[in-house]
Amino acid sequence: MPVPAPVLYPPFNILRLSHVEYMVRDLAASKAFYVDTLGLYVTEEGDGRIWLRAMEERGHHCICLTEGTDPSARVLGFKLYDEPDLDKAADWFAAEGLPTEWVERPHQGRTLRTADP
């Protein structure tokens, strides 16, 4: 299988995956798995959520567990290169007909939400 050619001049620059929010049925069991089995650290708990980070994570969290009835990966967050890239991403998603919304999220800076097609 050939390796696809890189996109050298993307419409905006993504540095890395930032965080994942998982919807889980049993918050205590999920906490035990991520903390006791995988060795992640709890950075905060409350209101049906647990924020976790790995040893080398520089931010507040890389995983958020949220209690709910439908287990799923609810959110994938990406770290962009800089603030202008966040504006470029908003413009690009809107031009592609995808929803865009500026949202407030605990422990995150300026945050843009969209949805994949």
Range-by-range predicted roles:
Residues 1-10, 16-25, 66-117:
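Vicinal oxygen chelate
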Residues 10-11, 64-68:
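Short, flexible, solvent-exposed loop/turn segments with mixed acidic/basic and small polar residues
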Residues 12-59:
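Core segments of cupin and vicinal oxygen chelate
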Residues 47-49, 72, 106-110:
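Short acidic/glycine-enriched loop/turn segments that link adjacent beta-strands
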Residues 50, 63, 112:
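A broad, low-specificity signal marking well-ordered, structured residues that form hydrophobic/aromatic
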Residues 60-64, 102-105:
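Intrinsic, low-complexity N-terminal interaction/targeting segments
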